[in-house]
């Protein structure tokens, strides 16, 4: 039986040992849902879309996300397993696993900052606010709460004879449902946002005010880059025109289902036993991990 069909059969009907032995605690509920995340960007260089779509199995704070097709950006990983103890990327074709940090996983979607040395980045003028904004749209049979997010920050890159300022402005809407059984580290919206250093810390602290399980999010990001050349007399040549890029980040949950837990469910959110652990650089594509 194919692995995906086997997982579906276990979810629908449970294992052969669905009842816990006398005196044992009740197994945690098992949750499945479809998760789609995408970032659509329009820049002076053109348009680009990065997306990930697949099925998530969540249990007791742990989760496994299996992509429906393809791999996560900048990697050969087709699945990710995550929980309170950490995060692991899985390459199904190679039967390989690699431990990673949440920042490593975020870098797959956002990319890493430029190599230090040629320019020294500094983050300035950071602000972030998350506010509750009443009730959101119902999600299946559950009510939701709506949150509004506003944030801004500026990254200053200094190099000999040139200063570049990159200002980022972010607005967004998040709808969440009180579904504790579905919650896991995969819910962290911070990994979808291009915030670095102090901006990431401030934004993360503000996003912690979001409650519940985020079933929908839409975030609009505008980035404006301008450059100046200190020491060059004004009027010598016109300054470069500012460059603007716009991105829309979405997260959407569909077809969520919950069933009673059964013995053996923990294997559905665990690293397969026949996978071999490798270094992270063996799964990343296009660059080596430090």
Which ranges hold each PLM region?
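Positively charged n-region of N-terminal signal peptides that target proteins for export
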Residues: 1-5, 141
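Bacterial Sec-dependent signal peptides at the C-terminal "C-region" and cleavage site
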Residues: 4-27
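Extended soluble regions of mature proteins
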Residues: 23-290
């Amino acid at each position: 039986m194919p692995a995906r069909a086997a997982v579906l059969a276990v979810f629908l009907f449970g294992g052969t040992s669905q009842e816990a032995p006398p005196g044992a605690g009740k197994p945690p509920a098992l949750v499945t849902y479809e998760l789609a995340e995408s970032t659509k960007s329009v820049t002076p260089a053109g348009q680009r879309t990065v997306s990930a779509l697949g099925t998530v199995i969540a249990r007791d704070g742990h989760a496994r996300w299996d992509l429906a097709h393809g791999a996560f950006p900048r990697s050969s990983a087709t699945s990710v397993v995550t929980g309170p103890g950490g995060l692991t990327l899985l390459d199904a074709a190679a039967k390989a696993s690699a431990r990673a940090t949440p920042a490593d996983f975020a870098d797959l979607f956002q990319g890493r900052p430029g190599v230090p040395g040629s320019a020294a980045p500094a983050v300035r003028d950071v602000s972030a606010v998350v506010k509750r904004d009443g009730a959101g749209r119902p999600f299946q049979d559950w009510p939701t709460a709506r949150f509004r997010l506003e944030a801004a920050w500026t990254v200053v890159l200094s190099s000999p004879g040139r200063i570049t300022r990159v200002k980022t402005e972010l607005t967004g809407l998040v709808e969440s449902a009180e579904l504790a059984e579905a919650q896991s580290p995969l819910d962290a919206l911070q990994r979808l946002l291009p915030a670095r250093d102090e901006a990431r810390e401030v934004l993360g602290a503000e996003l912690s005010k979001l409650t519940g399980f985020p079933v929908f999010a839409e975030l609009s990001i505008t980035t404006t880059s301008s450059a100046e050349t200190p020491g060059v007399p004004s009027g010598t040549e016109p300054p470069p025109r500012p460059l603007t890029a716009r991105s829309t980040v979405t997260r959407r949950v569909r077809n969520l289902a919950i069933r009673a837990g059964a013995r053996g469910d923990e294997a559905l959110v665990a690293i397969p036993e026949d996978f071999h652990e490798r270094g992270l650089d063996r799964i990343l594509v296009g660059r080596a991990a430090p």
